[in-house]
UniProtKB/Swiss-Prot annotation:
Lineage, highest ranks first: Eukaryota, Metazoa, Ecdysozoa, Nematoda, Chromadorea
Main location: cytoplasm
Keyword RNA-binding recorded: yes
Subcellular location: Cytoplasm; Nucleus, Nucleolus; Nucleus; Nucleus, Nucleoplasm
Gene Ontology CC annotation, any one: cytoplasmic exosome (RNase complex)
Family membership noted in the UniProt record: Belongs to the RNase PH family.
Subunit structure: Component of the RNA exosome complex.
InterPro entries membership: ExoRNase_PH_dom1, ExoRNase_PH_dom2, ExoRNase_PH_dom2_sf, PNPase/RNase_PH_dom_sf, Ribosomal_Su5_D2-typ_SF, RNase_PH, RNase_PH_CS
Function in brief: Non-catalytic component of the RNA exosome complex which has 3'->5' exoribonuclease activity and participates in a multitude of cellular RNA processing and degradation events.
Pfam families according to UniProt: RNase_PH, RNase_PH_C
GO terms under biological process: nuclear mRNA surveillance; poly(A)-dependent snoRNA 3'-end processing; rRNA catabolic process; rRNA processing; U4 snRNA 3'-end processing
Molecular-function annotations in GO: RNA binding
Encoding gene, per UniProt annotation: exos-4.1
Name recorded for this polypeptide: Putative exosome complex component RRP41
Keyword terms, alphabetized: Cytoplasm, Exosome, Nucleus, RNA-binding, rRNA processing
């Protein structure tokens, strides 16, 4: 089956530039400083943030806060059952990508000699998993009251022949489309994460990057509304 039909629709009924619905709930994990449950279409992610707290000597940075991320997936999260939901090569790679991205977002110099732990778990994966984790982490950090440069937003975009498609599903990803996962701050041009999957012709790179940046801006608008509403809801409680 073609990824884009002759009438211009994808397999799930979306247009090429249309993102899936985003639903969130903040503060579900009362043991964490901040948490977020995010549904991006059928992709479902839980994120919990702990800290800042005094770090161990082995991870202590004198001038800033250390960011430690752990990415994992449930054994039933994808199309295939997984025997090692965390600690495998791919999970470790994504954990490092998240760390580097949020080192650029969090005002780490505000908490020298301390550490912030971020745990992301994909409960159900239906494509754009890394992007969903970035978006959930941004809201979990906002829930925790961690000072940031702004809210980070992310999107995964691919290309079919010469046409970009945004917010890929797992079915679209399994077709081995060239794709880019991009994250920016406040939906602007400050890029904090780029991951390229499969070979992408240099002539198509700018097309995919432009589509990804535009999609990050759309996602940011959704996340910003959630963060603002959550802040308003918490304001009376903080005032007391």
């Amino acid at each position: 089956m073609s990824i884009i039909s002759e009438h211009g629709f994808r397999m799930d009924g979306r247009r090429p530039a249309q993102i899936r619905n985003i639903n969130t709930r903040l503060g579900l994990n009362r043991n964490a400083e901040g948490s977020c449950y995010l549904e991006h279409g059928n992709t479902k992610v839980l994120c919990a943030v702990y800290g800042p707290y005094e770090s161990k000597a082995s991870k202590r940075l004198e001038d800033r806060c250390a960011i430690v991320c752990q990415y994992s997936t449930t054994t039933f999260s994808g199309l295939e059952r997984k025997n090692r939901p965390r600690g495998d090569r791919k999970s470790t790679e994504i954990s490092r990508l998240l760390e580097k991205a949020f080192e650029s977002v969090i005002l780490t110099e505000s908490f020298p000699r301390s550490q912030i732990d971020i745990f992301c778990e994909v409960i159900q994966g239906d494509g754009s998993n890394l992007a969903a984790c970035v978006n959930a982490t941004s809201l979990a950090l906002a829930d925790a009251g961690i000072p940031m440069k702004g809210i980070a937003s992310a999107a995964t975009c691919g290309i079919v022949e010469t046409k970009p498609i945004v917010d890929l599903t797992s079915r679209e990803e399994t077709d081995l489309l060239p794709r880019v996962t991009l994250a920016t701050i406040c939906g602007r041009d400050e890029v904090i994460l780029v991951e390229l999957q499969n070979r992408l012709h240099i002539d198509h790179l700018s097309v995919v990057m432009d589509a990804a940046k535009a999609t990050c801006a759309d996602v940011y608008e959704c996340l910003a509304v959630v963060a603002q509403q959550h802040l308003k809801a918490c304001a009376p409680i903080l005032g007391n």
